[in-house]
Each structure stands twice: as C-alpha cells, then as structure tokens.
UniProtKB/Swiss-Prot annotation:
This is Uncharacterized protein C9orf153. InterPro entries: C9orf153-like. The gene is C9orf153. It holds the Pfam family DUF5532.
C-alpha cells in the first residue's frame, strides 16, 4: 500500500527520534504493567489493595500451618489400642481363695 501526500526529509528525521529501549527494559516495563494491572483489578473487584490481600493471605497461611501442626501432633497418638492376651495354658496362676468347709 502506497502512502499519498508530502513526504519530506523532516518526517524521516522524526522517525529516527522515536524512543528506543533494550529488550530487558521492554520486559521490565511489561512486567510492571502486569503488576499494576493486577493491583488495579484487586482493588476494583474486592475493594482491597495488593498489600492488604498479601497480609490476609499470610495470616490465613499462618493459621493453617498452626492448625496443621496441631493435627500432626494428634496423629502421633495411637488410633487403635491392642490388649495383649496370653496364649491358652500360659495364664498366670493366681491363688484362689480357700474355702473352709
């Protein structure tokens, strides 16, 4: 497609002055944009800032780890208790009370 109109050397110089950045700078800019977008979405959807959301999440994780740790200690207790029984014929003899007739 051809452009119609006046093309002067001044316009060509303007093209050379466009801002340029390196690839790492571009990635950093995009990453920053994504972070800001996430912050904005949290604020719009939940009325909460990113820092507040992180604090709430940290509190919830601390509570979960505390309760999970208590459950682990509870699991160390035996679930089934076994009574050891002697084999037949190996009973301990107890003296029977003597009855006087």
């Amino acid at each position: 497609m051809f452009l119609t109109g006046d093309t002067s050397p001044a316009e060509d110089n303007r093209e050379a002055t466009l801002p340029q950045c390196s690839l790492p700078e571009l990635y950093a800019c995009i990453e920053n944009f994504n972070k800001e977008s996430k912050k904005s979405n949290l604020l719009k959807m939940h009325g909460i800032s990113l820092n507040e959301a992180q604090e709430v999440l940290a509190r919830n994780l601390n509570v979960m780890s505390f309760t999970r740790g208590a459950d682990v200690r509870g699991d160390l207790q035996p679930v089934i208790s076994v009574n050891k029984m002697n084999k037949p014929g190996k009973h301990r003899k107890t003296p029977s009370p003597k009855i006087n007739k």
